[in-house]
C-alpha cells in the first residue's frame, strides 16, 4: 500500500470509530480507533511532505487521546460491574457522555485556534494595489460592487430599515475575463477586512473539519466586519447535488448555505463575493444566496484597446493611439488574460532580435552624447558583424517595440475561449444573471 492508501484507510476506520463513539458503542469504538491509528502510524512513517506529516501527527495524537480515554472508561465500567448491580452499569453511559462533552469543551478552544490559524493566510494584510481604473471596461460590475462594498461603509446611514446592502454577489464568465482582478480592486478600494479563499483552503481530508473551517471563516468575518469573503472557483465547493456527491461535499455545502443565510448570527456587514467559470454547475440553493449574479463577458473593442495600453505600461515603445485601436480590433474574441499573453510575447520580441542578430550598428541615444549598439540587417550602413555576447551591458540598446512585434505575437497566440462556452454563459445570463458591462 502507498502512503495515500494507508492514510485513506486510517481516516475511514477513524470515522467509523467516531460514529460508534457518538452512538455510545464505546467498546467497538475503542477497537476501531486503534485499528485506524495503526494505519495512521504507517502513513506518518512514509509521508515525505513536512506539512502533511505535522497534520497527520496532530490528528494521530488527538485520536490516541480519545482512545485512551475510552480505555479508562471501559476499565472503570468493568470494575463497577463486578461490584454493583446491573442497573448501576446503565448509568455509566451517562457519565461517559458527560466526559465526552467536557472533553469537547476543553478541546473546542484549541480546535478553533488551529482552524483560525489555518485560515489566517486567507486575510489580505496588504492591499493588492489594483484600482478601479486599472480594470478595463466592466462598468456595470464595478458599479454593483461599489454599491455593495463602498457605499455601506462610507455612508452607513443610507442603509436603514428595509434598505440593506447586497450580501452576496456572484461574478461569472469565461476564464481570464477579470473576475479575480475585480476582486483585487475591491480589496484595494474597500475599507474592509478581505478574506480570499479557494476550495483548497476549505476542504480538509479529515472528516468534519471542512464544515468547521467554513463556520470559523464566517465567524472571523463577523468579528472583523465590515468584511468581504471572496471565494474563488466557488463551483468546486457548491456543485449541483447528485447521486455521485460525497457526504463530505454535502456537509460543506449545507454549512455554507447556513452561514450565507446568517442563521442565528448577525451577518450584516459581511459580503460574500464568489467567482466561477461554470455558473450552470452551481447548486440552485447556493445560486439563490448570491442575490446579484453578474456576467463578466469577453472585453469589447474599447476595453481591449485599454488592456493593450495598460499591459504595455511604461515599457519604451513607438505605438500610437491608432496602433492600440488596431490591436484592439484584431483581437476580437480574446479574453483579458489572452491579451496579457500577447503583450508579454510582444515585449520579448526585441530581446529575441538581440539574441538572433548577427550584425549590430552604432546609434545615438536620447542625450546624443553616448553611442550604443543595436541589432541591424547585414546590409545596413555601418553594420558590424558580431554577436550580443561580444557587447558590454552598458553598450547595448534594445530595438524599438513596434506594432510589428504585436502582430507577430497575435499570429502565434490564439484565443482560449470557445464559442460553445460563450453560448452557455449567455444562456445562464438570460436565465439568472445580469450584464457586467
Swiss-Prot record:
Lineage: superkingdom: Eukaryota
Binding residues for ATP: 173-180
Molecular function via GO: ATP binding; ATP hydrolysis activity; identical protein binding; protein homodimerization activity
Subcellular location as annotated: Endosome membrane
Keyword Cell membrane: no
Keywords, ordered alphabetically: ATP-binding, Endosome, Membrane, Nucleotide-binding, Protein transport, Transport
Record-linked SUPFAM superfamilies: MIT domain (SSF116846), P-loop containing nucleoside triphosphate hydrolases (SSF52540)
Residue ranges of every copy of the MIT domain listed in the record: 3-80
Disordered, as annotated region: 74-114, 364-384, 418-437
A GO cellular-component term linked to this record: plasma membrane
Misc note: Present with 5350 molecules/cell in log phase SD medium.
Function: Involved in the transport of biosynthetic membrane proteins from the prevacuolar/endosomal compartment to the vacuole. Required for multivesicular body (MVB) protein sorting. Catalyzes the ATP-dependent dissociation of class E VPS proteins from endosomal membranes, such as the disassembly of the ESCRT-III complex.
Protein's name in the database: Vacuolar protein sorting-associated protein 4
Organism: Saccharomyces cerevisiae (strain ATCC 204508 / S288c)
Amino acid at each position: 500500500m502507498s502512503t495515500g492508501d494507508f492514510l485513506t484507510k486510517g481516516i475511514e476506520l477513524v470515522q467509523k470509530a467516531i460514529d460508534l463513539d457518538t452512538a455510545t458503542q464505546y467498546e467497538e469504538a475503542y477497537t476501531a480507533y486503534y485499528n485506524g491509528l495503526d494505519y495512521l502510524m504507517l502513513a506518518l512513517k512514509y509521508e515525505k511532505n513536512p506539512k502533511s506529516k505535522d497534520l497527520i501527527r496532530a490528528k494521530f495524537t488527538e485520536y490516541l487521546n480519545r482512545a485512551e480515554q475510552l480505555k479508562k472508561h471501559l476499565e472503570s465500567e468493568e470494575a463497577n460491574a463486578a461490584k454493583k448491580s446491573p442497573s448501576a452499569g446503565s448509568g455509566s453511559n451517562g457519565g461517559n457522555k458527560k466526559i465526552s462533552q467536557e472533553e469537547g469543551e476543553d478541546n473546542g478552544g484549541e480546535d478553533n485556534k488551529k482552524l483560525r490559524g489555518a485560515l489566517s493566510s486567507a486575510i489580505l494584510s496588504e492591499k493588492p494595489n489594483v484600482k478601479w481604473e486599472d480594470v478595463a471596461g466592466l462598468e456595470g460590475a464595478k458599479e454593483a460592487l461599489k454599491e455593495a462594498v463602498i457605499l455601506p461603509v462610507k455612508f452607513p446611514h443610507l442603509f436603514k430599515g428595509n434598505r440593506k446592502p447586497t450580501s452576496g454577489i456572484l461574478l461569472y464568465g469565461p476564464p481570464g475575463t477579470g473576475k479575480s482582478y475585480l476582486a483585487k480592486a475591491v480589496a484595494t478600494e474597500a475599507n474592509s477586512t478581505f478574506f480570499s479563499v479557494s476550495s483548497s483552503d476549505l476542504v480538509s481530508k479529515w472528516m468534519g473539519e471542512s464544515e468547521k473551517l467554513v463556520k470559523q471563516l464566517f465567524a472571523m468575518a463577523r468579528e472583523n466586519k465590515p468584511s468581504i469573503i471572496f471565494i474563488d472557483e466557488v463551483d468546486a465547493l457548491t456543485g449541483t447535488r447528485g447521486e455521485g456527491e460525497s457526504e463530505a461535499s454535502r456537509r460543506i455545502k449545507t454549512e455554507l448555505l447556513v452561514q450565507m443565510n446568517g442563521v442565528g448570527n448577525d451577518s450584516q456587514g459581511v459580503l460574500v463575493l464568489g467567482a466561477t467559470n461554470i455558473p450552470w454547475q452551481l447548486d440552485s440553493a447556493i445560486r439563490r444566496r448570491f442575490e446579484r449574479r453578474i456576467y463578466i463577458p469577453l472585453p469589447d473593442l474599447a476595453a481591449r484597446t485599454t488592456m493593450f495600453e495598460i499591459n504595455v505600461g511604461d515599457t519604451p515603445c513607438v505605438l500610437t493611439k491608432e496602433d492600440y485601436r488596431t490591436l484592439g480590433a484584431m483581437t476580437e474574441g480574446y479574453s483579458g488574460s489572452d491579451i496579457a499573453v500577447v503583450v508579454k510575447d510582444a515585449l520579448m520580441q526585441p530581446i529575441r532580435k538581440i539574441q538572433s542578430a548577427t550584425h549590430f550598428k552604432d546609434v545615438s541615444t536620447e542625450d546624443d552624447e553616448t553611442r550604443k549598439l543595436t541589432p541591424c540587417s547585414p546590409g545596413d550602413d555601418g553594420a558590424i558583424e558580431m554577436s550580443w555576447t561580444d557587447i558590454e551591458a552598458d553598450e547595448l540598446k534594445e530595438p524599438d517595440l513596434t506594432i510589428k512585434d504585436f502582430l507577430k505575437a497575435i499570429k502565434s497566440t490564439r484565443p482560449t475561449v470557445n464559442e460553445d462556452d460563450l453560448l452557455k454563459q449567455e444562456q445562464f445570463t438570460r436565465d439568472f444573471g445580469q450584464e457586467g458591462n
